[in-house]
């Protein structure tokens, strides 16, 4: 990457600024996404995660997960014109965050980025407004997947913490360390 950095960054900038938006490729990708999403119908982990997020978060919250069926419907209904409009509104240096990891030189990288992305304005940043989660009554939900020999257990609780709260990051790390996945200490 180091020796080809200018060329790689220039190609990246070109692809981000001027994507092809090929109609046939768009339809192929939609079918691929639908196929991948349909597999979630038989995935206990995915179905459990969706059920838990729906139990904790209201529909207007970004942490709320749509059902697999709703995701498939959204993919089917998506249009290339909507994708083009989204790109036009949101893509640009005003809202872009670029992370490059590897054997690179910061000064050369910065110069290459400035050269390749100069004169590209646009991209809006919007303050997201969404419905906050609130405490709800305890609930047990069973998600049945016929003929599935495995089962998964999901446990969640409303904490009232918001991302901006000082305790959010320590709580997040503690939660992950104790029980988020098979690496968690509660699974040992």
Q: What residue spans do the PLM features occupy?
A:
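His/Glu-based metal-binding/catalytic segments typifying zinc-dependent metallopeptidases
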Residues: 125-184
């Amino acid at each position: 990457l180091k020796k080809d950095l200018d060329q790689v960054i220039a190609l990246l900038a070109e692809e981000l600024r001027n994507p092809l938006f090929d109609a046939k490729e768009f339809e192929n990708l939609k079918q691929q996404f639908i196929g991948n999403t349909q597999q979630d119908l038989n995935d206990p982990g995915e179905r459990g995660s969706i059920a838990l997020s729906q139990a904790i978060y209201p529909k207007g919250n970004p942490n709320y997960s749509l059902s697999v069926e709703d995701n498939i419907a959204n993919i089917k209904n998506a249009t290339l014109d909507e994708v083009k409009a989204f790109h036009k509104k949101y893509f640009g240096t005003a809202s872009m965050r670029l992370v490059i990891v590897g054997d690179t030189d910061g000064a050369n990288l910065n110069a290459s980025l400035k050269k390749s992305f100069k004169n590209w304005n646009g991209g809006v940043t919007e303050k997201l407004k969404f419905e906050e989660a609130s405490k709800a009554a305890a609930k047990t939900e069973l998600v049945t997947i016929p003929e599935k020999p495995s089962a998964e257990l999901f446990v969640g609780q409303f904490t009232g913490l918001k991302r901006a709260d000082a305790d959010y990051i320590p709580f997040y790390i503690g939660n992950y360390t104790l029980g988020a996945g098979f690496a968690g200490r509660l699974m040992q």
